[in-house]
Amino acid sequence: MTPTIFISAGEASGELYGALLASSLRQHFAPKGQRAELIGMGGPRMAAAGVECVVRSEDMAVMGFTEIVLHLPRIYREFRKLKRAIRARRPTVAVLIDFPEIHFRLAREFHRLGIPVIYFVSPQLWAWKQHRIRLVRRFVQRMLVIFPFEEKFYRERGIEAEFVGHPLADLPPPSVTHEEFARGAAQINQDQWNYGPYSTTGLPAGTRPINGEIHDELDPHKQWIALLPGSRMPEILSNLKGMIDAAALLGNEYEYIIPLAPTLTEKQIAAIQYDLGDRILAGIEHPPRITFVRDARAALFHARASVVASGTATVEAALIGNPFVVVYRVSRLTYAIARRLVKVSYVAMANLIAGKCVVPELIQNDFTATNIVQHLRQLLPEGPARESMKMELGAIRKALHVHPAAGRGNHLGAIETVAAIIIREIEAAYPAAQEAAQP
């Protein structure tokens, strides 16, 4: 028999990890001509890696308390589709990647069916909703965490947890040169889902240029500033205006690059461009020069500095090591509720890992163009502020690796470590797969 592995991710970062994990699992089975069936929820990268995506992650990805309520009918419809697939296919093991709003409910379903659950990338229970610990204790067999302090948090609460390192910390720096990225002539790391500058000519029919200020190519002789508004439509539309206002205030001495999450559809990209033109750039006398790109890592690597919406992208920015400013804005109701529930001093993971304010955080009312520009003007030129942040970010990168010399882990990267743990779970649950599943 062929083992069936359920892999589920709901956001752009988790979807990347799901795709890398799917590829690693296939490599485990391939040498002896065996295979595993991979099903779950994901996006284009997971599908390209061989996962049969029963539900598309973009159909479930919403944010905030009020936003979730607005999309409940669609969420319930897609959730029922997932449950039907789980009952019909009866996976050997389930791997749930972050996205707790959906995955805790799925974990309950797997528990009912006697299917072991491995949770990869912990929900931020140490920050809020600690009552969900009981759900982890009841429905999750193994918690695999990507931040070092999370292992202690779970073990102190009687939950088996292991720090496997951060997947992004294992990636080499982007190999594309500044000039190549400017031309959009190279695909980063040979990944079929990463691209250079995103051409507006690839948008659906009827999409128009925006004020003449969206370009398909960057000027390699100017310094670039990356603007990362998020990976989901509501947060992108919420964060983009403040970022563009800051770019206009800073001026055309710089060019501005906006990486678009690979989980976004062409229709969503077109909607973002319309919003940019009709709502944002239309009111700016001297609009900044903007280029959309597909590869966030290369954008962060080649940008002189970045403005990054709070989320996984802040980890990516910290690992790249160039200075950045963290921003975020949600609805007033969402923010009011979050202030009562969140129990940490910082929102940026770089600051949480460091235990101090390494990167500036501009949240809600502090998220203004003036404040962004004030911080960027300190970080863009060579000087103490820039060098101090780069040094602190280097220390954070080291903290996100598992070091064999310290008696922890091995020489595998985070994804390979997770794959090996999944294989062992399959061997325990499905002895007939042991020979086929040997690494």
Regions found by a protein language model. Give the residues of each.
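Nucleotide-activated sugar donor-binding and catalytic core shared by glycosyltransferases
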Residues: 1-439
